[in-house]
From Swiss-Prot, chain B:
Component of the signal peptidase complex (SPC) composed of a catalytic subunit SEC11 and three accessory subunits SPCS1, SPCS2 and SPCS3. The complex induces a local thinning of the ER membrane which is used to measure the length of the signal peptide (SP) h-region of protein substrates. This ensures the selectivity of the complex towards h-regions shorter than 18-20 amino acids. GO terms for biological process: signal peptide processing. It comes from Arabidopsis thaliana. It is a single-pass type II membrane protein. This is Signal peptidase complex subunit 3B. It holds the Pfam family SPC22. Keywords: Endoplasmic reticulum, Glycoprotein, Membrane, Signal-anchor, Transmembrane, Transmembrane helix. Its main location: endoplasmic reticulum. Belongs to the SPCS3 family. Residues 33-167 are lumenal.
Amino acid sequence: MGWIGETVDSIKSIQIRQLFTQAISLGMIVTSALIIWKALMCVTGSESPVVVVLSGSMEPGFKRGDILFLHMSKDPVRAGEIVVFNVDGRDIPIVHRVIKVHERENTGEVDVLTKGDNNYGDDRLLYAEGQLWLHRHHIMGRAVGFLPYVGWVTIIMTEKPIIKYILIGALGLLVITSKD
Amino acid sequence: MHSFGYRANALLTFAVTILAFICAIASFSDNFSNQNPSAQIQILNINWFQKQPHGNDEVSLTLNITADLQSLFTWNTKQVFAFVAAEYETSKNALNQVSLWDAIIPEKEHAKFWIQISNKYRFIDQGHNLRGKDFNLTLHWHVMPKTGKMFADKIVMSGYRLPNAYR
């Protein structure tokens, strides 16, 4: 009971100016993270410069939980590149390797077929109904670098959202009750 | 300033920074490796060469692939992904690349190999342009590191030609 009284006292004793300072510092941290993310999007030319590998279709090269750094340049798509693409109607991007390229003479448009290294068949089963080839606008970026295991944090937070809430709650509590 | 929480936080930040730095250096060291891979591909046999019901040409080949990719492996290499692609041009398409075979090489010892197989993936054209077509066979490789930047390169072998008539 005395502990509850102490907490109530400490919340009552927060001055309004101190509260604003803390809120603004928190806001600055969140905003600078956002700035860094948007700057990365600009530099790499891709809508999502970092992706987490979610499935085992590219093993043993990329395992579930690895993160990939993407880059999208105007260079034409060529066989062997590892590309990240979105299928129409699905929002989870897929990371697979290009195995076939047919590039048109005049327009430079390109038909692309992909396949996961660890899959038996190509990706036609994953494409939209009746779609045989991917086109340039489906491709979000090429994988240029990779870091192992770092993506598990994101996977855990997505699959067990309760952990995300616990973390944010604990962070919020820490901010409110800290002395400086 | 000296509470457990502060110390744990400082330690964790420092550890993560050092880890990131080590990963970057490991990846950077890959730039200094001396690479001289070699390969040869022979077409042993054209198994069949037909026009499919909906109009596209398809050919099935038996290939003899000899390669030595051992110099591509560094201490930071997890695997090398090698594949052979047929590359040619047609009147409609400026470039066609069709992957015929690929393999994952997990270790340096497996990187010097000799293999005779028929094409793993179907060699299908967009159209019926393959009769008498000259094409290149290119061995591509993709070095996937334990951490950091991936490297890719290729050897182009030209002078291959498909027969003038279906069989």
